């Protein structure tokens, strides 16, 4: 593929044209809207669905996104349906589209998709979490209805990541489907379903930013020339513009590179200021725009220090992170935009500034929201090991290895321009037994650096071994105080590892404990993780103790609670019901924030004054003397029992206020906490003290 290198000199067009920027921007955007030829049509409605074992007449109408496992998998059926589902739709192709180029883009089908146009097989995609695209320009009948058939298969495969996982493998077309219509000469969408544009941040500082815009062009028209323009705006004015005339041979695909030089840039600065420029890349012929693509540009620079942690734009930034699976009650993984928005709103309420989107690429809209809200993101491929289970996460065969590389390239190219993404994750909980994955992970690491030298790689480990010394960053999944041991074990592990390997950039990729909001106890006892009893107060204690250990160790570059939300795992038989991993800080339906949520909110979100009385769901008390606890952003709080003050207590370093040996009277007791000041905050609950505990 022919390439043109970047040279960082201000273009002649730009010199002396600082005046009249607003007028120019208005006219330019008007021109774009007037002449832009690309169309993006959603094809989500009116699909006919049937399983392969059903006859043609058994179809039912569905709209996308859709999964056929929203009921059985979420009911905890370990044998939930894993097989082939057929989706068919009549698509009318307008006669005026003749002479254009047509593409079918799928944002996500799990995990194999075979696509047919008018019953002719046009292609297959293997992998359930990345987007893919097929050109159908010469495969459709213009002025007629065409059949689009997709055979989705979520059956077990030995050559597609992931092989295993502590989550559900929902089947279906669970993300959007698009029909893209472009000019014969276009910015190519065919490069692994990427935008066709890569904004490479080669040098970024408070003084200047040098960005190389790499643009894939595709031409089916006759030989000719076109003008390629790249325009950077800040929302109100043009910051810089570059253009170049390019020669295009018929049938050619070329890569053009244009330099962008921005003086004194406004940086993308996490949650504090998630500012992004907008970059419009457009193609012009004969003075008319024939195609355009717009991408975000969030300029930032960052690094991780083995002793001091993560730095964004030269300033230390403790990463207060969570992990997130992409499913929820009743809909499985077939999420709509409002579901992603609600998840992010809950994270921001809690004070989250980092996220690990586990264990696979998630919806583009989710990455868009991470950009918008300034949440530092760890994005990863679904290279998932067995964890505590008996299956294999790696099979050393060529087809599996190639599939993993394909999914890594898809992840990086499709999401390259998201400023929130700061880490590419390569694996989770692999084991060095049998087929040893070490050499393959080295290949993945080299591929990631080849695709994107600007971002560090990372991984999530749960054991010792050579796997921990491949990626630039390393993090561990730790459950000290849940799967046995105590929270103190985490401190021992971190200190020992940092001392033994001071060169390692150490993070915590998972830590958490299960909790049911229906399981309450007025004494603190560690439960069995595999049992049916998952008391909420143990989860709260677990997070309080683990967070104290983490916060006292600045060398830990980032920590990610497992998990922000309860999620589906059909094989689990524990907690208050089967089929749910209940380690979330919020329930599966997003309706209830657990107590540990408020502990983190008090510690991470100092912008929102709050007080929260813990263990309010524990309404029955059997101990005559109780300990009450509140989480607050205030320096102190006062406790009242039945209107009588039990005294004021100072909040500790971790925003927690505790009153011990509080006596209750038989029957109902009104417990209230309040903060001092002219605008006091209060929280209260009524509990019942019973002298006789049921057997």
UniProtKB/Swiss-Prot annotation:
A motif (N-K motif) lies at residues 581-583. It catalyses: a beta-D-glucuronoside + H2O = D-glucuronate + an alcohol. The active site is at 429 (proton donor). Coiled coil: none annotated. Keywords: Glycosidase, Hydrolase. It holds the Pfam family Glyco_hydro_2. GO terms for biological process: carbohydrate metabolic process. D-glucuronate binds at residues 428, 477, 483, 562, 583. It is an enzyme of class 3 (hydrolase). SUPFAM superfamilies: (Trans)glycosidases, beta-Galactosidase/glucuronidase domain, Galactose-binding domain-like. GO terms for molecular function: beta-galactosidase activity. Its EC number is 3.2.1.31. The N-K motif seems to be a discriminant that could be employed as a fingerprint to identify beta-glucuronidases from the large GH2 family of proteins. Belongs to the glycosyl hydrolase 2 family. Displays beta-glucuronidase activity with the artificial substrate p-nitrophenyl-beta-D-glucuronide (PNPG). Is likely capable of scavenging glucuronate from a range of chemically distinct xenobiotic and endobiotic glucuronides present in the gastrointestinal (GI) tract, to be able to utilize these diverse sources of carbon. As part of the GI microbiome, this enzyme would be able to reactivate glucuronide drug conjugates, such reactivated compounds can significantly damage the GI tract. This is Beta-glucuronidase.
